[in-house]
């Protein structure tokens, strides 16, 4: 059956509008899962909803295509829910108000949720169409944005009887994603012995307005890590005078390069100008080491209220040594794909709590052995510094498949349909594909998507001219997967 561009556009946007009407914050997907289940049943598909509210939707092969291998189309139902300043928005009750200006689809003051609502909408639309295809399975997962717990919990049996998986959670229409990085949460803790401050002057040292960014996608941009910078500052001050450290903090998520950090300390010195030398030294260092990419940072040290408690010199030295000696940033580049980071680590957040200082480190690699290796290095470093370090369960990596038939079919079909080449690359960030690969290493997996810009922000917008070609690409690829 031949479909016009308008039919495809209207059909997919209608499916997306259904999703936008249902609040679907991560870990609150029951309503959207129930809606999609009933909708898929209404057009004749078989549906399984697991205890996590993941959906497994099966469509029988078209007549004459029963012997073709099964193809999975996959997306996630949850979305990142954020609103612009001043916008009244409750992620648990408020629908997304869609604005279509003919060029972009966006929301009125909130994130749009095209990540990954548009992937789910495209799959739902294709499940209703008549064309040559083998058995199709749509898998819609929960909680991709916060923990990938849906993909992690998915029963492997839904992956073992398929040959191909098309993930629809990428954001660039002309880019085919071949692999993604795994990761592991490394958590360090120093138990603190508190005492009353002996010094009567207190100061707050702040580094802020560094660039920051995603600790996977932006790790090779060379941005400064604010946590590492303040550890240098503490060392510099310790060389000039005796101090008592009261707190150290940087509160961004572990998958964000810290753009700001601060520490509070006491000193026998009552003249803040003494510390201006350290401020100037840190500024000079940032300009020399990061001046090409860090343009707007500020470094300050100002008097503050005397803290009620400070940590021992041993505790402070242990924490600062661990941060200073921790390897962060790009640790290894790929020897196979030019420009691809193979191993990295990000330090932050750092939190001073009631009885401890907690430090988070987040290593990434598509090679699971490297992720485990760097986690073990942090554990050994912690022992040297008197810091308790534990490593969580690693999220697996998804390595590129050099023999991928699906990759060649996608690249060929894209060129035929669009008249120019699609780029194929790996990313140094996480995708649910990693868990699917771990459950079935023989599954041929790729990831694609239309142009979705400024995701996870109120400026998120979907470029409409890439939507129909994206849907046509999925359909065209499936029509060729006869063996």
Name the predicted role of every residue range.
Residues 340-426:
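Substrate-recognition/cap regions that form aromatic- and gly/pro-loop-enriched pockets
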Residues 218, 223-227, 231-248, 392, ...:
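Active-site-adjacent substrate-binding region
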Residues 2-104:
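Acidic/His- and Gly-rich active-site-bordering loop/insert found
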Residues 77-79, 111, 139-147, 169-173, ...:
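Acidic, glycine-rich active-site loops and adjacent beta-strand->loop/helix elements
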Residues 95, 101-106, 145-146, 151-152, ...:
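Midchain, well-structured core segments that form catalytic/ion-binding scaffolds
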